[in-house]
Amino acid sequence: MRSDVIKKGLERAPHRSLLKALGITDDEMRRPFIGIVSSWNEIIPGHVHLDKVVEAVKAGVRMAGGVPFVFPTIGICDGIAMDHRGMKFSLPSRELIADSIEIVASGFPFDGLVFVPNCDKITPGMMMAMGRLNIPSVLISGGPMLAGRYNGRDIDLITVFEAVGGYKVGKVDEETLKAIEDLACPGAGSCAGLFTANTMNSLAEALGIAPRGNGTVPAVHAKRLRMAKEAGMLVVELVKRDVKPRDIVTLDSFMNAVMVDLATGGSTNTVLHLKAIAESFGIDFDIKLFDELSRKIPHICNISPVGPYHIQDLDDAGGIYAVMKRLQENGLLKEDAMTIYLRKIGDLVREAKILNEDVIRPFDNPYHKEGGLGILFGNLAPEGAVAKLSGVPEKMMHHVGPAVVFEDGEEATKAILSGKIKKGDVVVIRYEGPKGGPGMREMLSPTSAIVGMGLAEDVALITDGRFSGGSHGAVIGHVSPEAAEGGPIGIVKDGDLIEIDFEKRTLNLLISDEEFERRMKEFTPLVKEVDSDYLRRYAFFVQSASKGAIFRKP
């Protein structure tokens, strides 16, 4: 066993002595040591209950004959970090999470690992660490929050963000806003729509590294604890058989994950995260795969923020394995991909049942004929940009409008809420990329303001920053190269016409080639003052969003 290096032989007596200080017995020294990394804390709603999930994992490890050891990592709630300096640290925390786990699991040679995340950057950060370490592993998340209820309808956090915009234009009164605020988030779990956290936890199932139901079983359901026990038992079996993450996760696994992402209409952030995770697994993954598959995979799940359903509805309908059954029915699922169950995913999916034909529609009756995400290219995005196609209003699928340029998200939000943005405008927010922000902040407030102000059918937004999984509308993010790296988004001027064609996947600045070249030659990127040692280091090492915003290798 990997842990024998600290357990076996006379020369390891000091190591055993320290382990015995923890209460470890001689009998336990002969068993697999299982590390359990948890992002439990008391400030994130999605993490506040992870201590209970961890206890269930520990029970499962012991049931299977292993010895559990819990260690922590950090976490940030993007919702609470929104609209202030804290959002600059959200994406950078992903790298720190992966690094910290790699350090602990290398310093202590565990035989296996169980990863217990829940929210936006924590799940991908842990998945990156899993790929790097390549120790027998299972991921079990904390699960989604239940939707809130107001005035007879389901609501969630995005309802609150959009109600703020509604209040600004007199569509929502203060009493209603307060009621929505009080009821939208009823308890523990990752926010209830198909936002980044729930998308990533769902894709962990499709990758084969998490138990069935990982992405959809509500946080407060007892089934979540039973799944956690199962995760603890599974990892011990993987240790005994010496099955490692790279034995399970292949390019076919990533293709399954992308197809699930497109079919469900997942978060745009998945493009960024899957690229980074693939890199950690040593897999060559081109983001163009999203666009190639999007032409074949229809959008069949209408889940918030683009539809009325929530994750609990998807769970009731059969969950992610039922979505994969639709792929299987149409001959698209990569059935030979392996799973932590030591069974092929195709065999497991055959056992799944689709329990609601509207929540998980058949391919011949989709919500949209193409998948939920698209990659756009053009003179404004030579390396690509990302859009949530399932959230684009029909009349905005092709749009030409004048640019209104902002150098950060706050100024854009103020302008939108103060009525300075008019129908037809294209809001351009730049210097919000991985290096330029630094930190590639989410632009949830400006997009929610556009929706709340009643402009979603008439205004587009493009940025080198990111979007929350809760953003929707004619919005395009991850524009690469970013402005801080000399990208063309940096040369856009107020009033310039921008053409967006979501069907053709193009994004272009409508100026002459000569004017374009002149501006690019004269362009000197703005350099922002950065008041954080960590963010200065992050900005120095981070690569383009088109490369997953991972660090450059020395």
Swiss-Prot record:
Pfam family, one: ILVD_EDD_N
Nucleotide-binding found in the keyword field: no
Domain of life: Bacteria
GO biological process: isoleucine biosynthetic process; L-valine biosynthetic process
Transmembrane regions listed in the UniProt entry: none
NCBIfam families attached to this UniProt entry: ilvD (TIGR00110), PRK00911.1 (NF002068)
Function summary: Functions in the biosynthesis of branched-chain amino acids. Catalyzes the dehydration of (2R,3R)-2,3-dihydroxy-3-methylpentanoate (2,3-dihydroxy-3-methylvalerate) into 2-oxo-3-methylpentanoate (2-oxo-3-methylvalerate) and of (2R)-2,3-dihydroxy-3-methylbutanoate (2,3-dihydroxyisovalerate) into 2-oxo-3-methylbutanoate (2-oxoisovalerate), the penultimate precursor to L-isoleucine and L-valine, respectively.
Protein name (Swiss-Prot/TrEMBL): Dihydroxy-acid dehydratase
Source organism phylogeny: Bacteria, Thermotogati, Thermotogota, Thermotogae, Thermotogales
Gene: ilvD
